[in-house]
């Protein structure tokens, strides 16, 4: 089922890219494997999937212990500072939403002697439950720090669209992030990645310039909540 789902999804991504004149190779498909076991991840690996996303730092840690660097790991969930020591095992951290968190990631990355790829999470909707940087001034402050930190490689921005059926609100959330990214790039920053789009809204995200899609249920099916 997982292999079939991946093929259907890749075909759909190709179709949307053709429609909006984009190269499908410019988009990373991140399979969000939270609450799924190593066996399901291995099925996806056998189907050619190499990018995986985890929302919980300790779940990432336990899966990394089993699979290691066979795959590329993306930490995409809300990150508490006391869990950074686990999250820095990932190749990418998408959810940097404060200066103090960026500083903590820098500290751990320096200790490990690694350059940590990160994205700054921006709040582009009014939903209280959504995390992310609010306000351009705060965003510039964090981006400036990350751009100058010795062990951080700031590669882009991330957002989560509002949970709504109103497509205009979803599109605005994504286009706002793209415009912020363009503005930062015009000021000398080099941010190539836009992490936006999940199972319910990835088509709009591609149309608005997403380069990283975070997709779970369209690949693995509905989540089964169990422990590893």
Please report, for each region that a protein language model flagged, where it lies by residue:
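Conserved alpha/beta-domain cores
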Residues: 1-200, 208
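Expand to "…catalyze enediolate/carbanion chemistry for C-C bond making/breaking, isomerization
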Residues: 206-207, 219-227
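A short hydrophobic/small-residue beta-strand
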Residues: 51, 212-213, 219
């Amino acid at each position: 089922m997982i292999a079939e789902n991946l093929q259907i999804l890749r075909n759909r991504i190709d179709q949307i890219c053709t429609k909006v004149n984009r190269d499908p190779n410019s988009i990373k498909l991140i399979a969000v494997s939270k609450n799924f076991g190593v066996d399901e991840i291995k099925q996806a690996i056998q189907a050619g999937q190499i990018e995986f996303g985890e929302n919980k730092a300790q779940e990432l840690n336990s899966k990394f212990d089993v699979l290691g660097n066979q795959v590329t790991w993306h930490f995409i969930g809300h990150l508490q500072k006391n869990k950074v020591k686990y999250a820095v095992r990932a190749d990418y951290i998408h959810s940097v939403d404060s200066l103090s968190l960026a500083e903590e990631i820098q500290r751990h990355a320096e200790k490990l002697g690694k350059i940590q790829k990160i994205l700054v999470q921006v709040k582009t909707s009014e939903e209280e439950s959504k995390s992310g940087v609010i306000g351009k001034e705060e965003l510039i402050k964090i981006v400036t720090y990350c751009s100058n930190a010795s062990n951080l490689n700031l590669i882009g921005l991330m957002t989560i669209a509002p949970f709504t059926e109103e497509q205009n609100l979803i599109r605005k959330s994504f286009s706002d992030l793209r415009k912020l990214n363009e503005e930062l790039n015009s000021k000398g920053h080099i941010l190539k990645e836009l992490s936006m789009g999940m199972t319910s809204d990835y088509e709009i995200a591609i149309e608005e310039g997403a380069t990283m899609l975070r997709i779970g249920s369209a690949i693995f099916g509905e989540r089964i909540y169990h422990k590893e």
